[in-house]
Amino acid sequence: MFYALLLSAAALAQQAPAPTDQPTIVVTGQRLQDYRDALARCLARHCPPNEDADATLALAEALFLNGDYHEGRDAVAASLRRNRNQARAYPEPVSDLYRAHTRLSRHLGQDIDARRSAYGILSALQEGIPQEDYRHFTARLELSEYLMLGGNYNGARRELNDLIRIARAAGREDVATLAELRMLWFQNIAQPESDARAQLLRMTRETAPAQRMRSTGAKLLLARIYRREGRAADADALLAEIGRSSAASGAHRRLISAPNYVLQVQDPNDINDNNGESIPTANVLSRMSDNFEDKWIDVGFWITPDGHVSDLEIVRDSNENGWADPLLESIRGRVYSAAAEPTYRLERYTYTAPYERVTGTNIPRRSRRARVEYLDLTQNEPPPVPPAAASSSHRE
């Protein structure tokens, strides 16, 4: 389902590499039509909201993979019009529709709609499931991320504070810890002069078994900060403390650092990082108008056991990928957490820009603040053959 792809807070299990061909994610016209027909049959028999949502999300996922963002977003929006009033009886299907609409809107530069739908993810759950649980916690984490991506640090902090309070009341100290770490990461981005780094440093020194998650998370975040500052030795020392206990084959590979990149002219007012776990989004200020329609690439690469990127290639793209050269160079320079085996990643990147209204007219136009939107596609496809052992030291 499309909503599984959109769950940025989830840790996705990697399958062991198997000797297969390069992944193929082309969605044929006939297959797309099959999804359209399935939704049409569902609506013709007046299917219940949960079946409507399932058929819609399956179509939207296929359309997204094929680069048909507008049709996918329109399909989800139509399902929301049919079902948004059914959240009390069908909270999860309606919430999933809002989640898909949020992601598609972000990739199309429809940031105002994306923000509204991000709130809808949580509100639909609250309407049908008053007692908050893991579903609400995930929605609150997502909402905080979208608020931060939009530069609304105070809103993101407010949502995370609410999550900490609610999670602790529910006995979920692990969720509260995750929210605390994310808030410190946001604080370090928005207010570098704050004591966020000092708090992270104190967390790294906690040795009680019950505080292992807090200590490990703080070390990972500090390692990212140190690498950004050119303190590679300090970052490596922190990672060595963590050890390889959680780096078994198939474990989630955490991004430790990535070189900054600029597509044209960097906008110094934009925040170009999010929650410390997903891939940074670079915002740029274009001095010339640009065409942001149908510009996306699917990038495949291996992460070697020592955490470096190998055998990177563009697996598929739309009609032009010249904009992506700085992005690809940044991906090649990434450092991930270590693991016992190489792991494969497949990622979608979309070149887009938000719409804005110009003084004196109600006609929205593209902003000159371009950006790249990201979505992990790894769980959808089997990996190709892993690189030879020599590739660990040779970065493509």
Where are the model-predicted features located?
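Gram-negative bacterial Sec-dependent N-terminal signal peptides
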Residues: M1-P19
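Charge-biased low-complexity segments
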Residues: Q15-E396
